[in-house]
Amino acid sequence: GGTGGTGGTGGNGGAGGSGGANFNGGTGGTGGAGGDGQNGTTGVASEGGAGGQGGDGGDGGEGGGAGFGSGVAGAAGAGGNGGKGGDGGTGGTGGTNFAGGQGGAGGRGGAGGNGANGVGDNAAGGDGGNGGAGGLGGGGGTGGTNGNGGLGGGGGNGGAGGAGGTPTGSGTEGTGGDGGDAGAGGNGGSATGVGNGGNGGDGGNGGDGGNGAPGGFGGGAGAGGLGGSGAGGGTDGDDGNGGSPGTDGS
């Protein structure tokens, strides 16, 4: 089967407006979420297509500058969340005495966007976006008469979290944004079949957490995906591994 298309990239957040005298600047816009990957197509008596990769989240917009007098700068925009990876296609049905096709692997989740840097006195950096979840593995194809079921496809890996924005300013430094959490890995596909069931696919690995900006904290690690179940006597797939935590800012 054919491979699913790649998800679209999230849009960048808009810049916050400048504050007037004694007023705060406007908050930067949040980056748009990445588009979902397209599903893989179903294979015909063959292996299912792999899911497409989720789109990356857009970076956050810059915060507005400080107003005249004692105005305070606006907060920087957060990064957009990564898109979910596409699901793998189902394996094709086997002919007589032949096994079904293997399911396609799930697509990787998109990475979270980076938070924007703070601008001006006491301007906080934006938070990093969360990584997208990995796509689900496609189910194994049905075995033909006397044929075994196909293997389930592996789950996609979670996307990495975005980094928090760096605080900047000529006066007191603002606080850095937190790193985004990584997306969870996708589940392995279940095996099916008229004869003996095929083995379930392995779960995808969780993505790594995003790194914090100076002063910020690293994002949490994504959870590993669940292994697919082996129906009809097949072996269950292995669970995916969790991602590594993000690094704290200094």
Regions found by a protein language model. Name each.
Residues 1-249:
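Collagen triple-helix signature
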